[in-house]
Structure formats: structure tokens, C-alpha cells
């Protein structure tokens, strides 16, 4: 089992990574030395089918546990599900020494974390991610639900008390979900670690990754994010660099319809555009075409659906929470392994997006 500490201005907590460590969950929770009266286990429906009974039994040997099953997919991050979970918590007579555990992917973690942040003005919560994508979202304390007008518009910064990452659970992931999660690993390399990026570039497929390779990628990705969050917990500075690929990525997700394209595929499209902007605006020296072809070779899409018009996408991007005074903060690369931001107007963004889309479909 690997262990690292995430330290922020407001808290510090352990991240445990290893195969089969879900079976040690009760012992790991006890080692935190937190008062714990009850557990609300918030679990993804598909994860519940595979591991729900086992996890309930393991925890229920030590504490009273109530299981709440949430839908798989982005639709779970709704105000309706948020209210349902809070109702379950109240009916279970949870108090301020109770705990919520998120057992699922990033969606489950976002939802459970926001519920914990707001129940009785904040109770403990634990992240138990079950997807590769969640290696990113489980660390750093961003929790939220969606609004019909945009993703993650209702949320908070609220750190978990621990992250328990059982990599054995990744073995049941379909290739599409593995690829989705790998996009965030690649993002971390692009913005913060050239040597790690060079290592990733040696992989021409995501099939057949060994447990050791996955564990190392997860550890490296979380280490990079932890270092960023340590310096900037609430996205007032360099934490914004973690949004590399996400400005367009979130717009693509919204226009395709949540669940119609994976988060990772959308972010990969966003990174391809961000590489183009890095070249055009930040004068980043790189072999962009080669990097783009590598991403496509791993199975990521190389262009956005033609029926989605550029002005619609640029309007979505300008509605991003990083927009200030008619300018949106866009993350680019100064060089491979080092990020910076730039401010773009709607016209500049639209012009760059038009040129990139014409190039990608040429």
C-alpha cells in the first residue's frame, strides 16, 4: 500500500493507494482518531451491484451504517439527489459526529462531498473512489452539484478526512472508463511534469496496463495535484492550472448532453484545443501534431461534432465560472510540463476555436 499526505491551508489528510485495501476500510477509518457515530454510505448503483453488500458488511461490523444508492452517471449530481440524500441523513438521525462515505466515481464523490459540506454545516466525509477518473476529483476538496444552466455551479471547497483508493476495483472498469480517467493523468503531466509526460508518451495503448503501472500513474497524478492544492486550496492562483482542457471540455459535455460523451473524452478534446492555443498565443514550442495524434491513437476523439456550432461553444465557455469582466481565464502551456494562464475575450476565443476546428477537419 502506498500512502501520501495532502496538505492544504485548512487541513491535512492521508491518501491510501493499493490493491484490496477496501477490506481495510474500518481499520483505516479508526486510525484517523475521529469521533464517529454513524456512517451514511453513498454508493453508485453499479458499484453497489458489485461491492455494495461487502462494503456494508465490513463497515457495519463497527458502526451503524445506512446505504444510499445513487444513479450512475452525471444525472446523480442534481439538486433532487442532493435533497434525497439529506432527507435520508435526517431520517437516519445523523449528528455532527457522523460521516458520509462516497463509494463510486467522481460524480458520487462530488455529490456526497457537497452533502457532507452542508449537512449540519459540515460533517466528515471519506472518498473511496472506484474509477481512474476519480483519482483527480477525490483529492482537492472541490464538491458540487450541477444546475440546468451549467456544470458544478452549486458547490463548495470541502476536504475529505481521507481517501481510500482500492486499485483492485479498476479491473472491472470498461476500456471507455479507463480512457476517461487517463485523460486527467495526462493533464497532470502536461501542466506540471515533463518527465512524466515523456514516460506516458511511450504508451501507444491503454489496454493491458499492469497493476504496477496503474498504481504508479495514480500516485504520480495525485502527487502533482496535491502539490498544487497545497499552494492554492481555493483556486485563487495556480490551482486554476488544473483546468487545462476543461474550459472547452465542459462546454462539449454540456452540448453533447451529460452522459453522451465521457468527461475524459471531452477533456481530451479540450486539451487538443488548449495545445493549439498554447502554440498560437503562448508560443509554446512543441510538436503539437504529434501530441494530438498520440491522443487520438489512445482512442480519444479528434474533433467535435460538426452539428455543434462554434458560437454556441464559445458562449458556453464564456459562461464558465472563471470568466471575469467579459474575459475568460484560459489555461495554456508555457512549455511542456509548465502551465500559465491567459485572458481571452469571446471574439478571440471564437476565432481560435474556428481556426482549430477547420484545421482538425481538413
Curated annotation (Swiss-Prot):
EC id = 4.2.3.4
Keyword S-adenosyl-L-methionine included in the entry's annotation = no
Query: What is the scientific name of the source organism?
Result: Bacillus velezensis (strain DSM 23117 / BGSC 10A6 / LMG 26770 / FZB42)
GO biological process per UniProt:
amino acid biosynthetic process; aromatic amino acid family biosynthetic process; chorismate biosynthetic process
Cofactor or coenzyme needed: Co(2+); Zn(2+); NAD(+)
Q: Tell me a GO cellular component.
A: cytoplasm
The gene coding this protein: aroB
Where, subcellularly, is it found? Cytoplasm
- Residues binding NAD(+) are 72-77, 106-110, 130-131, 142, 151
Q: How is the cofactor bound?
A: Binds 1 divalent metal cation per subunit. Can use either Co(2+) or Zn(2+).
Gene3D superfamilies xrefs: 3.40.50.1970, Dehydroquinate synthase-like - alpha domain
Print the keywords alphabetically: Amino-acid biosynthesis, Aromatic amino acid biosynthesis, Cobalt, Cytoplasm, Lyase, Metal-binding, NAD, Nucleotide-binding, Zinc
- Where primarily located? cytoplasm
Q: Which SUPFAM superfamilies match?
A: Dehydroquinate synthase-like
Q: Which positions are annotated as binding Zn(2+)?
A: 184, 246, 263
What is the official name of this protein in its record? 3-dehydroquinate synthase
Q: Enumerate the Pfam families for this protein.
A: DHQ_synthase, DHQS_C
Look up keyword Metal-binding and say if it applies: yes
Amino acid at each position: 500500500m502506498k500512502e501520501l499526505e495532502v496538505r492544504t491551508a485548512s487541513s491535512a489528510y492521508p491518501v491510501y493507494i493499493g490493491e484490496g485495501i477496501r477490506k481495510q476500510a474500518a481499520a483505516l477509518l479508526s486510525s484517523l482518531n475521529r469521533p464517529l457515530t454513524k456512517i451514511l454510505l453513498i454508493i453508485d448503483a453499479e458499484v453497489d451491484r458489485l461491492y455494495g453488500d461487502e462494503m456494508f458488511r465490513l463497515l457495519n461490523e463497527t458502526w451503524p451504517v445506512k446505504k444510499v444508492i445513487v444513479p450512475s452517471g452525471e444525472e446523480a449530481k442534481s439538486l433532487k439527489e442532493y435533497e434525497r440524500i439529506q432527507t435520508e441523513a435526517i431520517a437516519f438521525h445523523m449528528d455532527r459526529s457522523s460521516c458520509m462515505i462516497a463509494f463510486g466515481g467522481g460524480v458520487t464523490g462530488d455529490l456526497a462531498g457537497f452533502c457532507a459540506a452542508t449537512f449540519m454545516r459540515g460533517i466528515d466525509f471519506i472518498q473511496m473512489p472506484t474509477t481512474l477518473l476519480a483519482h483527480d476529483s477525490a483529492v482537492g476538496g472541490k464538491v458540487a452539484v450541477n444546475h440546468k444552466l451549467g456544470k458544478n455551479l452549486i458547490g463548495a471547497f470541502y476536504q475529505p478526512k481521507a481517501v481510500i483508493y482500492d486499485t483492485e476495483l479498476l479491473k472491472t472498469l470498461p476500456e471507455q472508463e479507463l480512457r476517461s480517467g487517463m485523460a486527467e493523468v495526462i493533464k497532470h503531466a502536461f501542466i506540471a511534469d515533463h518527465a512524466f509526460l515523456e514516460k506516458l508518451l511511450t504508451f501507444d495503448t491503454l489496454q493491458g496496463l499492469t497493476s504496477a503501472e496503474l498504481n504508479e500513474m495514480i500516485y504520480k497524478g495525485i502527487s502533482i495535484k496535491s502539490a498544487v492544492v497545497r499552494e492554492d486550496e481555493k483556486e485563487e492562483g495556480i490551482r486554476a492550472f488544473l483546468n487545462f482542457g476543461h474550459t472547452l471540455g465542459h462546454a462539449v459535455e454540456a452540448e453533447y448532453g451529460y452522459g453522451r460523451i465521457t468527461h475524459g473524452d471531452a477533456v481530451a478534446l479540450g486539451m487538443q484545443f488548449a495545445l493549439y492555443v498554447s502554440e498560437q498565443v503562448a508560443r509554446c514550442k512543441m510538436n503539437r501534431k504529434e501530441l494530438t495524434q498520440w491522443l487520438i491513437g489512445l482512442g480519444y476523439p479528434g474533433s467535435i461534432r460538426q452539428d455543434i456550432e462554434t458560437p454556441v461553444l464559445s458562449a458556453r465557455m464564456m459562461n464558465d465560472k472563471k470568466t471575469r469582466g467579459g474575459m475568460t481565464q484560459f489555461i495554456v502551456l508555457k512549455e511542456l510540463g509548465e502551465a500559465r494562464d491567459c485572458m481571452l475575450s469571446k471574439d478571440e476565443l471564437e476565432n481560435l476555436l474556428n481556426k482549430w476546428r477547420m484545421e482538425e477537419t481538413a
